[in-house]
């Protein structure tokens, strides 16, 4: 699939830029409470957008840092939409923790009934790429073609009970208090809980069997789009936290190997 191969190349180039620029030092800015952005985020996004536009000038782009991409006329006219996070895990990056990545997803649109924030889309994810430059791990998938890590096919774990599983979550800047009772409930249910600080990698780690379940609130489409497809192609399940069909713009997500999914939903329903 050419568009997937192009996305893989673009993700690697962005990852190389992140490593190169990180060695030069950088200024940290705040987008909001506990929400950081660096010049490296912006440089990575600028490169990704430039490369996409050079290859696919008629495609639309939804990107984390560049607000103008949300209002392009091409959004309504484009058949394909690229959903990109140029540096997922910025706080880790800013503190020298090597758990961060580039996330790129490609959405094939059928119809759009959009508000100014484009909070409703009809279509399907056709490709997803997540590249972790510090570990040189490239996760990717295309619809109905399986999921891969550095060229090797991956699948979710076979853990059947949360008591035997390793779960993971995150605390977005605006949803910390909301997640506390869920964290407490899962802490009692799980073998252990981790908090990595990169939603895209949390999802990919489920896809390759490192984690068994994941939930988080208050996310954006660029946080989860690529990872959601990669999990599904690896045999896992992705919904919202109530077990309903995932809405990329719905902010809340529950993902698992599929075997512990119902148990996690039931745990959440008791909160």
Walk through the language-model features, giving the residues of each.
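Residue-level signal for inorganic ion chemistry
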Residues: 18, 41, 52, 90, ...
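DPxDG-like acidic metal-binding loop motif
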Residues: 75-148
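Solvent-exposed alpha-helices and their adjacent loops that cap or buttress functional pockets
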Residues: 29, 73-76, 120-121, 140, ...
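An extended, acidic
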Residues: 155-271
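N-terminal subdomain of lithium-sensitive/metallo-dependent phosphomonoesterases centered on the IMPase/IPPase/PAP
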Residues: 1-87, 111-114, 245, 259-260, ...
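Acidic active-site catalytic centers that drive phospho-/nucleotidyl reactions
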Residues: 41, 45, 64-65, 85-88, ...
